[in-house]
Amino acid sequence: MKNKQWILKKFPVGEISDGDLVLEENEVPSLSDSQILIRNIYLSLDPANRGWMSGQKSYVDAMQTGDIMRGGTIGIIEESKHEKFKIGEIVNCMGGWQQYCVSDGKGVRQIPQGTGFPLDCYMSILGMTGLTAYFGLLDITDPQPGETLVVSAAAGAVGSIVCQIGKIKGCRVVGIAGSDAKCK
């Protein structure tokens, strides 16, 4: 079976340009024991993607040239040799910019079915972005009704959710963003 994959060929200098990422078609490897094959159906394209292409270690290990471009995905398990995961289950993981990924199950999260939430919510409000906003605001600051909450990067993914949670909690919310256009 063939797998289309975006490969980091060189570290971009400034803006990403042709040739930094290349679309390749490779064979999907056979599974070993305790592995799963996931067919990706959603890919989260995030500002962090550009930072990961720097070759520098940050909160995650640095990418190397030749790596599949890193990215969060939602997918369906197509094949399983892992006792925890069953064929047909929907999961969230760092599956990368590719049609299929093979995983040993580490970092793979099963998405509950029958919740009524669209799947893409598990990559935003019910995923890392939403959890960062929720716990970062409510566990760290404990905002109270009537308080003023100042949010930097308020136009960003996490910041915009922090603003909404602040409003729900009864705060006066002041958002800061990097440009006039982002403030509109």
What is the meaning of each model-derived region?
Residues G95-V108:
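A structural motif shared across PLP-dependent enzymes of the aminotransferase-like
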Residues P12-D18, P47-A48:
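Short N-terminal binding/cap micro-motifs at the start of the first secondary-structure element
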Residues M1-K4:
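Extreme N-terminal starter segment of soluble prokaryotic enzymes
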Residues G127-K184:
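Mid-domain Rossmann-like dinucleotide-binding core that forms the NAD(H)/NADP(H) cofactor-binding site
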Residues E15-E27:
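Short glycine/threonine/proline-enriched tight-turn/helix- or strand-capping micro-motif at secondary-structure
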Residues V28-L45, M53-W97:
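Glycine-rich beta-strand-centered segment in the early N-terminal region that forms part
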Residues R39-Y42, K106-P145:
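Extended, non-globular alpha-helical segments
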